Structures are given as C-alpha cells and as structure tokens.
C-alpha cells in the first residue's frame, strides 16, 4: 500500500492524454524554434502537402530564421482515437501563429488543422496534416 502513490506515477498516460501532451510538445517546439523537438514528433513517413519529413525540417529552419520571435497557439484541440487499434488518431485544432524580427509581429495567420497521429514505441508521432486558413 505504501508504494501505491509511487507506482501510480510510473503508469503510462491514457492515449488521449498522451496525444494531447504530444500536441502540446509540438506547439512548444514550434514556438521555441526547437527544430529537434518538432522533428522528434514527426514520423519517418511524415507528409505535409508535397513535403516529406526531411523537407519539412529544412522548411522549419527557414521559417525560424525568418521569424526569430514567434508565438504559436493550438486552440480547440479535439482528439479522435481509433477505437479498434487505439494506436492511431486524428487530432484537429485551430492554430494561431504570428511572428517577426522584433516584439511586434510582422505576420500573423490562423489555420484549421487536421492531423493524423500514430503510436510508435510508446510515443505518438505525427504522420500527416492538412491545414487551411480560417478565412478560406
């Protein structure tokens, strides 16, 4: 009984909580300009439009250099877990992004994002995503 609180801390979080945590880590990596943290969340077969994982990494470096000061917020995050496998999921959210070289943003946009995730070795990785502007 005395070990119960310690053992509880070692449990794997439920899939939905783990997915929300993975999305939050992605958000934090994007805002912080941490290419490594973002790349750690991308599956080996990741796709975004015509970009594969490697090309997405190069694009991130360019964006981070162009906008050294940036903010990223994921809002209205909804997780839809595959009820059969519990290893695949769709996560949708609104993304608000803005950035620039100084304190005031030079550019800002908002997107509706639909992303597919897969559990690999205990970690949730992003397989692909679709984003469209909220003004579209």
Located regions from the model:
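Short, low-complexity N-terminal intrinsically disordered segments enriched in polar/charged residues
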Residues: 6-34, 40
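Second-shell loop/turn segments in exported
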Residues: 25-27, 43-49, 102-103
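Short solvent-exposed beta->alpha transition segments
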Residues: 39-78, 84, 93
């Amino acid at each position: 009984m005395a070990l119960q609180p310690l053992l509880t801390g070692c449990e794997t979080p439920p899939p939905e909580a783990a997915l929300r945590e993975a999305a939050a880590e992605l958000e934090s990596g994007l805002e912080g300009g941490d290419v490594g943290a973002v790349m750690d969340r991308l599956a080996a077969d990741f796709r975004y439009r015509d970009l594969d994982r490697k090309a997405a990494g190069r694009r991130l470096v360019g964006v981070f250099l162009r906008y050294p000061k940036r903010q990223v917020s994921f809002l209205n995050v909804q997780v839809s877990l595959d009820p059969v496998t519990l290893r695949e999921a769709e996560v949708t959210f609104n993304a608000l992004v803005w950035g620039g070289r100084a304190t005031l943003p030079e550019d800002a946009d908002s997107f509706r994002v639909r992303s597919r995730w897969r559990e690999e070795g205990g970690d949730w990785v992003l397989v692909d995503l679709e984003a469209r502007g909220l003004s579209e």
